[in-house]
Regions:
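Helix-to-loop junction immediately C-terminal to a conserved catalytic motif
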Residues: 83
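ABC ATPase NBD Q-loop/coupling interface
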Residues: 92-109
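Conserved ABC ATPase "signature" region
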Residues: 146-164
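Conserved ABC ATPase signature
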Residues: 169-173, 177
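Conserved catalytic motifs of ABC-family nucleotide-binding domains
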Residues: 190
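Catalytic Walker B motif of ABC-type/P-loop ATPase nucleotide-binding domains
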Residues: 194-197
């Protein structure tokens, strides 16, 4: 990954300048920047655990970024820092270049700007109707009822919540429907950054597809910066622009999807793997077949192979005519 040195802000010490020079996935104007973050559970106790160890990372504005790593790698701890749900022991979290803890009394405003959907958010539903649950956040923002309705309808459309269940109790819904309602409740607040921890955990393939398609469409149509934590490299490949790989409380690598998946050997070394179809396409390329890079789905691979075979067929027919 390209690492470039940036000019230190006025008054920043040499150590901070060195830290910003080692930021992974670096961009000039990141939406979120982590600078040398360390987070310790049970600090100064016999049970001390270093969940994050000197993490520096940029999250690009408007992108859909996936964070992947094994249990205990630090990914869930990291996303709770983005909106100040927890506070690092060392380092800074910057949102649009501003330290989110510069004015601690204003941290509540940060949480409106960075929406966080925890794992299994359906357990947080509590209102009498689906509509009221999705509308809860916007109403707390003191919006007019007309704007609340507009936001509820928009969020419901993105997450696949049908109109005919709006007056039902959320507790009468299936698990997948509850999940979509819970995610819609955060989307309806229109945060600048939407962070989701394993949004499709426990869902069947159809439910996973519905959730991720809605999130991808939300990102494309609104320009909202979206961050997804997932254990599935298939999901990373299919839906994400950028990928962050975590291992042993550190960011192992970060960059575009193509950049990260090109380092298949390093991923396998930490027990992760690229999608099977991508691995097959890479083997075909190594064998001399003109397979394009960046094929992560069966449909895309099939289309590319058909095109290659058709081109070879046309070439053979051309030789026969001559």
């Amino acid at each position: 990954m390209k690492k470039t040195k940036t000019n230190s802000p006025k008054g920043q010490n040499e150590q901070s300048a060195h830290e910003s020079a080692s930021i992974l996935n670096q961009t000039e104007n990141p939406k979120i920047r982590l600078e040398n973050i360390t987070f310790i559970y049970g600090k100064n106790s016999p049970f001390e655990v270093r969940a994050l160890d000197g993490v520096s990372l940029d999250i690009h504005a408007g992108k859909l970024t996936g964070i992947i790593g094994h249990t205990g790698s630090g990914k869930s701890t990291m996303i709770q820092l983005f909106n100040g749900l927890t506070r690092a022991d060392e380092g800074r979290v910057l949102l649009d270049g501003q330290n989110i803890w510069e004015h601690p009394k204003d941290i509540g405003k940060i949480r409106y700007r960075v929406g966080l959907v925890m794992q299994y958010p359906e357990y947080q539903l509590f209102e009498e109707t689906v509509y009221a649950d999705i509308a809860y956040g916007p109403r707390n923002m003191k919006l007019s009822e007309g704007e609340v309705r507009e936001r509820v309808e928009e969020a419901a459309a993105f997450t696949g919540v049908p109109d005919d269940i709006m007056d039902k109790s959320p507790f009468d819904l299936s698990g997948g429907q509850k999940r979509r309602v819970a995610i819609a409740g955060i989307m309806a607040m229109r945060p600048e950054v939407l962070v989701l921890d394993e949004p499709a955990a426990g869902l069947d393939p159809g439910g996973r597809h519905t959730i991720f398609q809605g999130i991808r469409e939300y990102n494309r149509r609104t320009g909202c910066t979206v961050i997804i934590v997932s254990h599935s490299m298939e999901d990373m490949a299919r839906y994400c622009d950028d990928v962050v790989v975590m291992a042993h409380s550190k960011v192992l690598m970060a960059g575009s999807r193509d950049q990260v998946f090109a380092r298949a050997d390093e991923l396998e070394a930490v027990g992760l793997d690229i999608p099977q179809v991508t691995k097959l396409m890479l083997l075909l390329r190594e064998g001399g077949m003109p397979v394009p890079a960046g094929l992560y789905t069966t449909a895309a691979a099939e289309e590319a192979l058909v095109e290659i075979f058709e081109a070879a067929k046309r070439e053979r027919e051309g030789r026969r005519i001559k």
